[in-house]
Amino acid sequence: MPSSHIVLKEETRMLGLMYAIWMNLNSFGLAIIGILLIACEIILFLTKDETIQWPHVPSNRGSKANLILKELQLLVRSTWWFHRETAQRTCLYLA
């Protein structure tokens, strides 16, 4: 009887050790992810203020952003116009 108790105790220790190692690896992984996110945020902040300028990035980022915004607005307006026309035709058909 005492030998089975010792085996059970060692298995419990082994499970506890494996759990502790697993939790340490998880917390280490989360810490690395957090550090990477903070580094990305710092880099984005510095590039936004143009403290850092990448050589391959064109300087007309603002005009590209405005162009994309205008295209999105045009898409939204055309979609709204299409649905408005469809609704008018449906109302005429039902009347």
UniProtKB/Swiss-Prot annotation:
The chain crosses the membrane at residues 27-47. The keyword Transmembrane helix applies. It is a single-pass membrane protein. Keywords: Membrane, Transmembrane, Transmembrane helix. One of its GO terms (cellular component) is membrane. It is found in: Membrane. It comes from the Eukaryota. This is Putative uncharacterized protein encoded by LINC00301. It comes from Homo sapiens (Human). The gene is LINC00301.
